[in-house]
From Swiss-Prot:
InterPro entries according to UniProt: Ribosomal_bL20, RIBOSOMAL_L20_CS, Ribosomal_protein_bL20_C
GO CC annotation terms, alphabetical: ribonucleoprotein complex; ribosome
Function per UniProt: Binds directly to 23S ribosomal RNA and is necessary for the in vitro assembly process of the 50S ribosomal subunit. It is not involved in the protein synthesizing functions of that subunit.
Segments forming a coiled coil: none
Record-linked CDD domains: Ribosomal_L20
Family statement drawn from the similarity comment of this UniProt entry: Belongs to the bacterial ribosomal protein bL20 family.
Source organism (scientific name): Carboxydothermus hydrogenoformans (strain ATCC BAA-161 / DSM 6008 / Z-2901)
Protein name: Large ribosomal subunit protein bL20
Keywords: Ribonucleoprotein, Ribosomal protein, RNA-binding, rRNA-binding
Amino acid sequence: MPRAKSSVVSRKRHKKILKLAKGYFGAKSKLFRVAKQQVMKSLMYAYRDRRARKREFRKLWITRINAAARMHGLTYSRMMNGLKKAGVEINRKMLADLAVNDKNAFAELVEIAKKNL
C-alpha cells in the first residue's frame, strides 16, 4: 500500500494561516512558519485586548463624568454617592454620554446628587 501524502491537507492549512497573516510586514505574511508564529501572537493580543477594551472604556467614562461633575462643583465619587442615595440607576456609559451631549440633563442629575448628599 502506498504512503498517504498529506499535500491537500497541508496546502489547505498553509493557505488558512497565510490568509490570516495577510497585511503583515515582510516575511510574516509570506513564509508559513513565521506567519504561523505571528498569527498565534496576534490572536493572543486580540484575546487580551478584548478584555482590556472594557476597562479602557470604563476609565474614559469615569474621566468624562468627573470632569463634567467638577464643572458643577462636585467630584466624581460624591456625585456617584449622591445618585446612589437618590435611587438613580443610570450607568456610567449613559452618564458620560449625557455629560458630553446633553449638558442640561447632566446638570439636573448633578443637582439631584447634591440634594441627596
